[in-house]
Regions:
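Conserved C-terminal beta-signal and adjacent last beta-strands/turns
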Residues: 242-343
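Face-selective signature of the C-terminal outer-membrane beta-barrel domain
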Residues: 1-94, 167-176, 201-206, 210-224
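Extracellular loop and loop/strand-boundary signature of outer-membrane beta-barrel proteins
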Residues: 2-10, 17-19, 48-59, 87-93, ...
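Surface-exposed extracellular loop regions of Gram-negative outer-membrane beta-barrel proteins
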Residues: 41-48, 91-96, 100, 108, ...
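Outer-membrane beta-barrel signature, preferentially recognizing the C-terminal barrel domain
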Residues: 11-13, 60-62, 95, 101, ...
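Gram-negative outer-membrane beta-barrel transporters
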Residues: 74-78, 171-181, 195-277
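Outer-membrane beta-barrel channels and translocator barrels
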Residues: 25-29, 76-80, 109-113, 154, ...
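Residues on the lipid-exposed face of transmembrane beta-strands in outer-membrane beta-barrel proteins
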Residues: 18-24, 67-73, 104-108, 159-163, ...
Length: 343
């Protein structure tokens, strides 16, 4: 259940997923081929409390079948190529799709300390259980699956470089642009529901620099840039939002001990600007800047059985006004939280 002031969204869904994969490897070629099927059956209930209680129920059904094959080729002159093709068949309440998705990626190592990467690929967003799949999720190091609106179709274009400056200093840059066709249900002039699509564009850039002066200490600095724009439907579940720009700086320090204990402290400095359409009376834009401090204490179990971690998020209980583009997996928590994980 997800709640806002005056209403609740309640979901009751049953999901089934099955996947099969075949692996082939020779001296210069490795091949991953497979198929999958996903089925969702359930209902969403929107409960209103003001001015009087009532609810709206919507049946949800989603069928998604896919096939794929990825070939990784070891080419001369330290070049590795990726060529792939996938197909998606979708039958859902919102839209039906039949898509063929080419994949092309290349990595080149002109020197022992330098790696260049590039990729162009098409993909379709699926309603996966916890976003889990055994299909390759990266093409030349670029992520191809995101938590978008289900059945979204998008082309991605990426370029990046990873550099080893010395035995103790590493860095890199990456840029990825995604052009999306996002399905949604609209209302025609007669008041009847119709299937429609919105054009989204996402531009994401990142940079990192890590330094390990000694074997028990690591220092790092990361920068992330995100720019989201759309025309018709809201971003991040907030009506009227037509553009979001994020700048995020992440300094971090990590400590390690040979007995299996490790500790990490990191901060996020966030600068977000939001653009709204003419239907929002509060104004055309707003922004917020804030710091959030997090920490984790971990222990690696013997024989690599797993890692136990005590994690603290938003340690100083920082308040902020932030729209997350991934509501199911938010980057920042609005209040202090401490939890234990086992991986």
């Amino acid at each position: 259940a997800t709640g806002w002031d005056g209403l609740d969204l309640l979901t009751d869904n049953e999901r089934i997923i099955g996947e099969l994969q075949h692996l082939y490897k020779s001296d210069r070629i490795s091949l991953q081929s497979g198929a999958g099927y996903f089925y969702l059956d359930g209902k969403d209930r929107l409960v209103f409390y003001d001015p009087f209680p009532f609810e709206v129920e919507d049946k949800v059904e989603d069928k998604h079948a896919n096939l794929y094959s990825y070939a990784q080729l070891d080419l001369p002159h330290e070049v590795v190529g990726t060529i792939g093709l996938s197909g998606d068949l979708i039958d859902s309440n919102v839209t039906d799709r039949e898509e063929l998705n080419p994949k092309l990626g290349i990595t080149w190592q002109p020197a022992d300390s330098t790696l260049l990467r590039g990729a162009v690929f098409k993909a379709v967003t699926r309603s996966l259980i916890n976003s889990q799949t055994i299909e390759p999720t990266h093409v030349a190091g670029f992520n191809q699956f995101f938590r978008d609106v289900p059945a979204s179709v998008y082309w991605s274009y990426g370029i990046g470089v990873d550099q080893k400056f010395s035995q103790k200093v590493f860095g890199g840059l990456q840029f990825l642009q995604r052009d999306l066709d996002v399905p949604y249900q609209d209302i025609d002039d007669a008041g009847m529901p119709i299937s429609a699509e919105d054009d989204w564009r996402e531009q994401m850039a990142s940079a990192y620099l890590y330094w390990a002066p000694v074997n028990w200490l690591s220092l790092g600095l990361e920068y992330f840039y995100e720019d989201f724009s759309q025309e018709e439907i809201e971003i991040g579940g907030v009506p009227g939002t037509e553009g979001i720009t994020n700048h995020r700086l992440v300094p971090q320090v990590s400590f390690f001990h040979s007995c299996g204990f490790s500790a990490r402290v990191w901060a996020n400095y966030v600068d977000q600007k939001r653009e709204f359409n003419e239907f929002i009376p509060a104004g055309a834009s707003e922004s917020d800047q804030f710091w959030q401090i997090d920490a984790a204490l971990s222990y690696r179990l013997p024989k690599r059985y797993g890692i136990v971690s005590l994690v603290g998020k938003n340690l100083f209980n920082e308040e902020f006004n932030y729209i997350d583009t991934d509501q199911a997996n938010p980057k920042f928590l609005p209040e202090q939280q401490v939890f234990l994980t086992l991986t």
